[in-house]
Amino acid sequence: NRFPEGKSESYGQLMDAATGRVLLQDGGFLTTAKWMPKSNRLYYTRTGLDGTELVTVDPSTYQQTVLVPNLPKGRFVFTPDESTLLYTVEEEGPKEGTNLIRVLEPADRIPGFRDRSFIWRYDLKTGLYEQLTFGHTDTYINDISADSRYLLFSTSDRVYTSLPHSRNSLYKLDLQTMAIDTIWEKAPYV
């Protein structure tokens, strides 16, 4: 909704798809809530007493349950079996000295160029939070298998001596054994 003087208001609605009836209208959690991958529940995060809470909502009863009272920071997705959260965590890259700055490539002049994103896993049953990827390139979550066993993730490198400049790699990680299978590596323009 738009109000005078540029003010605005946002809200979310939960509707019964069969009847079109609005079950719940909310300007709070519904604006950020997402559906769980398997169960018929919504989830969202909020600030709690111990930190960020992961909360689930049963839309039929509106009952809210705190699934995790102190959630790690970062962007996450649920695995399809709803037992694990896979995070993308941004880490600050190395800093150069103030007297002499070594520019690795033209984009190195952009603030945050050396920052990297890595994939972490948070087990909802045990609370174990572990880093799955590391290195000098960003890693991106591409997909998770329906049985939640395999993670497809990718990396991207820049090569300025040939066109196209980017080289992409795609890997399959077995989340039980931690074995990696290379789908393709350093493929130009995929």
Describe the role of every protein-language-model region.
Residues 1, 33-41, 76-84, 142-150:
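Blade-terminus and WD-like Trp-Asp/Gly-His loop motifs, strongest in beta-propeller folds
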Residues 1-13, 26-30, 45-55, 69-73, ...:
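A flexible loop/linker signature enriched in serine peptidases of the S9 family
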Residues 16-20, 58-62, 123-127, 174-178:
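Short loop/turn segments that connect beta-strands within beta-propeller blades
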Residues 20-25, 63-68, 128-133, 179-184:
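A short beta-strand motif characteristic of beta-propeller blades
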Residues 38, 122-152:
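Extended amphipathic secondary-structure runs
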Residues 79, 84, 88, 126, ...:
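Ser/Thr-centric signal marking residues that sit
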